[in-house]
Amino acid sequence: MDPVTVSTVISAPREQVFDYLQDIANHSEFTDHFMVDWHLTRIDSVGRGAGARFRVKAPGNRFSWGDATFVEVDRPHRIVETGRTGKNNRIRTIGTYELAPGASGTTRVRFTLETAPATFADRLVESLGARGWLKRKNARSMRRLRAIIEDGEQRGARVTVAAG
């Protein structure tokens, strides 16, 4: 599937936005409308190596568990997470958050999600509307991220090691 990219502009300094995003426990707050049942993979949820498992609430998704682990954390510019999802965790995923300074102290956040389906069946399932669905859900996540950082609104539950 072609990469899915969404972005938003947040009225906050880039360092503040980065500090929020580099804690994977915070990600459940702005993605819980389609990613649920979060569990951290280690106690330290900040920085390189931090990870989580979760279920993706997608229509017709029989194999809903996925995971993500931060593999690159370049303060305050970029965070890269890799993971797996789908049947037997055979679909590789790469998510990249890129933060750029904007006008008047704002921050432009761009999130790109790439998937690498392993089989013809996985590619077929993705071709049946997954790209549009992911774009809509991730665009909503960016709006929620902006509301949380700017106003403290639309907060979901923060995940813990034993689930949140």
Q: Which residues are covered by each model-predicted region?
A:
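Short, surface-exposed coil-to-beta transition loops
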Residues: 3-5, 63-68, 90-95
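Amphipathic alpha-helical segments that line or abut small-molecule/effector binding pockets
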Residues: 15-18, 139, 143
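Generic structural detector for well-ordered beta-strands
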Residues: 7-11, 55, 69, 98
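Conserved catalytic core of Hanks-type protein kinase domains
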Residues: 20, 30, 72-73, 136
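Beta-strand/loop substructures that line and gate deep hydrophobic ligand-binding cavities in soluble
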Residues: 82-140, 156-159
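Glycine-rich portal/gate segments that line the openings of hydrophobic small-molecule binding cavities
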Residues: 39-88, 106-108, 140-164
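Hydrophobic ligand-binding cavity/cleft-lining segments
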Residues: 1-45, 163-164
